[in-house]
Amino acid sequence: MASLTAALATPAAAALLLLVLLAAPASAANFTCAVASGTTCKSAILYTSPNATTYGNLVARFNTTTLPDLLGANGLPDGTLSSAPVAANSTVKIPFRCRCNGDVGQSDRLPIYVVQPQDGLDAIARNVFNAFVTYQEIAAANNIPDPNKINVSQTLWIPLPCSCDKEEGSNVMHLAYSVGKGENTSAIAAKYGVTESTLLTRNKIDDPTKLQMGQILDVPLPVCRSSISDTSADHNLMLLPDGTYGFTAGNCIRCSCSSTTYQLNCTAVQNKGCPSVPLCNGTLKLGETNGTGCGSTTCAYSGYSNSSSLIIQTSLATNQTTACQRGGSGRSQFARSMWSMSVISFHMVLIIICFL
């Protein structure tokens, strides 16, 4: 390997290289997956582009997503061109499919990186992939016995960290986040709408004051509730956080998420070759709502099947917005309180009668 030969040209350079490799952590992150092995879901990393580039180049570099899904993951307009510029040092969410195996989550056989002249595994891990992965993890994933021996044009699977675990029983999308200079867990949690205690527990952090720059955190982002069936091929892939959108069912369905409702909003895309979308109860089109307030129902996307031909499924969904759920919970709690007060009052009356 040319880079290794150059590095070992002098004893001093060889010693420096050895120190760098020994100092590198064996694991960039410890993302656990408690779900069944083989489970897949949507995850992402928050990538910082070291140089000026374009969205099209990022799609090609990571090869884990399409341009429409990359734009959706970052809340950018649908019509944004692949040539649109990405400034140096700006951050972009890169979505990918996560697969859980043996209590560990890693990107599902992608991205694939082709070794270039002068490349080394540590440089690939740090400079190309923001140190979301270590050279040891790349070597292990590709069955490379000697990390110093890789060849130009060799293809490498880069195992990015991820998870498909739920958080307190709710679906989330796990974002791999690299801690910036001077950042703390409280500010990071507030930025992404999670509690600091959740962030600390998820990342097994006992002392938040010891957070280090470049440390990789698992940030479980809240996602919109959906009506997608567990039997649908995309039931774990449409995990959309606030302000994002995505395409599914052969790009025939577009779904978006907003924190105003936290309820997945899906509409049909009028693409050539897309099948007709069934009405709900014979009257409501996909995305249409009947009624108002917490008693309203919406024709929701519930998945697709594609055994012989693409079939899109819909179903009626009740209003599951946060406001309505809180209202229902509040009313139930109020009713229980009133019942308790009635029982207490009744017993007080009996006690008073006994003393008369």
From Swiss-Prot:
Q: Which UniProt keywords apply?
A: Cell membrane, Chitin-binding, Disulfide bond, Glycoprotein, Membrane, Plant defense, Repeat, Signal, Transmembrane, Transmembrane helix
Decide whether keyword Transmembrane helix is in the record.
yes
Provide the free-text tissue specificity comment from this protein's UniProt record: Expressed in seedlings, roots, shoots, stems and flowers.
- The intrachain disulfides are 33-100, 41-164, 98-162, 100-164, 224-257, 252-274
Q: Where is the signal peptide?
A: 1-28
**Subunit composition?**
Forms homooligomer. Interacts with CERK1. Binds to chitin oligosaccharide elicitor. Interacts with LYP4 and LYP6.
Which named protein is this? Answer: Chitin elicitor-binding protein
